[in-house]
């Protein structure tokens, strides 16, 4: 009799604990919609093709508010593709406060996969990620808005003979994915800038890779009103000269109303893709002691770029190979297909950028857009309104 009573009480206690835990998890994750911006769809650029809505159709049970990595992972719910809105209300340390100890450890814990039909949006200026990467891989219909992502620091860079130390891990990755909108996102080296690198075996111990990679047949992507700052190898579109079978005809990306501030190169560098960049602001200095400006547009194998009404404020530009100093903005690797209309270089209207490539790029774009005439006041407005906390 006593044993039965004890067993009954134990079962009852266990059931109560399970119910309490379930209720606690539910109350932590489920939330009301804190901003109608979370239900907006991409309105211009390549991401409009087919429609990029993210989690706009999320049921009330799939709307979350998260403030730490445990809550964030629970809200993502693995590969669940039901529409979901994840509102980030605090600074999320992807490492969970536990330092990475090796390459394998960092790979296992720092790469956070984002499923299809998801909107991740920061609330106010609280939505931040450090010590990891947001990985959009093999999915479609994803929106990132109003977020700050600090570029991860590789704890175990690998050495390549003739090329020195190289790092893995980007702040964000779009890999074999379609219909992605990145809006009002800031990506920066933040608290660990490149001047903090040490040396190892007599060479610079590089611990940053890219800010954003778009690769492996990804398509229909728009990057808008975002800020990329304090970084070296910023945006790579198309990861390999030998990946044409997957990339050709894809990697179509629009950049508009973004700011690239004190970044060295790759804004972007493109292989195989078709890039449309309009009304962006580029700020840099060839003589910057930490992030010296090299170039903005990198034309890799079969890459094409249309530049319209952008603003370049770049100090100490130099003539390269006898060309106008402005031509350092466009670096030719294995492609020369490029056109520019109406951009300003150091405040002056110029058509000289068009002389920096051999073949003009005159695409027929399937979406509507309005490239505003670039002026100093427009450049200032774009600079003031780009990045997280400005939505």
Curated annotation (Swiss-Prot):
Main location: secreted
Binding residue positions for Ca(2+): 170, 213
Gene Ontology annotations of biological process type: pectin catabolic process
Entry note: cofactor: Binds 1 Ca(2+) ion per subunit.
GO CC annotations, alphabetized: extracellular region
Lineage: superkingdom: Bacteria
A Gene Ontology molecular function term of the record: metal ion binding
Active site: 266
Keywords of the record: Calcium, Lyase, Metal-binding, Secreted, Signal
Top EC group: lyase
Reaction(s) this enzyme catalyzes, per UniProt: Eliminative cleavage of (1->4)-alpha-D-galacturonan to give oligosaccharides with 4-deoxy-alpha-D-galact-4-enuronosyl groups at their non-reducing ends
Cell compartment(s), UniProt: Secreted
InterPro entries: Pec_lyase, Pectin_lyas_fold, Pectin_lyase_fold/virulence, PEL
Cofactor(s), by name: Ca(2+)
EC number, UniProt record: 4.2.2.2
Gene3D superfamilies: Single-stranded right-handed beta-helix, Pectin lyase-like (2.160.20.10)
Segment forming the signal sequence: 1-31
Function, as annotated: Involved in maceration and soft-rotting of plant tissue.
UniProt-recorded name of the protein: Pectate lyase D
């Amino acid at each position: 009799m006593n044993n039965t009573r004890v067993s009954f009480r134990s079962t009852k206690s266990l059931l109560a604990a399970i119910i309490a835990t379930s209720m606690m998890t539910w109350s932590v994750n489920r939330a009301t919609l804190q901003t109608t911006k979370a239900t907006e769809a991409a309105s211009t650029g390549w991401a409009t093709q087919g429609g990029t809505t993210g989690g706009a159709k999320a049921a009330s049970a799939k709307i979350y508010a998260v403030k730490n990595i445990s809550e964030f992972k629970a809200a993502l719910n693995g590969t669940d593709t039901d529409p979901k809105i994840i509102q980030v209300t605090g600074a999320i340390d992807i490492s969970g406060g536990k330092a990475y100890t090796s390459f394998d450890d960092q790979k296992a814990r720092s790469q956070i996969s984002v499923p299809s039909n998801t909107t991740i949006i920061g609330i106010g200026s609280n939505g931040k990620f450090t010590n990891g990467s947001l990985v959009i891989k093999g999915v479609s219909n994803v929106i990132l808005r109003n977020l700050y992502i600090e570029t991860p620091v590789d704890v175990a860079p690998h050495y390549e003979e003739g090329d020195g130390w190289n790092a893995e891990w980007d702040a964000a990755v779009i890999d074999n994915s379609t219909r992605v909108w990145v809006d009002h996102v800031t990506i920066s080296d933040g608290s660990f800038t490149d001047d903090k690198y040490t040396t190892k075996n007599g060479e610079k111990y590089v611990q940053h890779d890219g800010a954003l990679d778009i690769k492996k047949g990804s398509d229909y992507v728009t990057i808008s009103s975002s800020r990329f700052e304090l970084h070296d190898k910023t945006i790579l579109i198309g990861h390999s000269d030998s990946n044409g079978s997957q990339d050709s005809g894809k990697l179509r990306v629009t950049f508009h109303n973004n700011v690239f501030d004190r970044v060295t190169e790759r804004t972007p560098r493109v292989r195989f893709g078709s890039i449309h960049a309009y009304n962006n602001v580029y700020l840099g200095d060839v003589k910057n002691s930490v992030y010296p400006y090299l170039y903005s547009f990198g034309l890799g194998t079969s890459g094409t770029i249309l530049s319209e009404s952008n603003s370049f404020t770049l100090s100490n530009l130099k003539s390269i190979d006898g060309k106008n100093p402005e031509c350092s903005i466009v670096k030719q690797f294995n492609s020369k297909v490029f056109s520019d209309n109406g951009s300003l270089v150091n405040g002056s209207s110029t058509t000289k950028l068009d002389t920096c490539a051999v073949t003009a790029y005159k695409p027929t774009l399937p979406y509507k857009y309005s490239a505003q005439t670039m002026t100093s006041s427009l450049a200032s407005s774009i600079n003031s309104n780009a990045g997280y906390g400005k939505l």
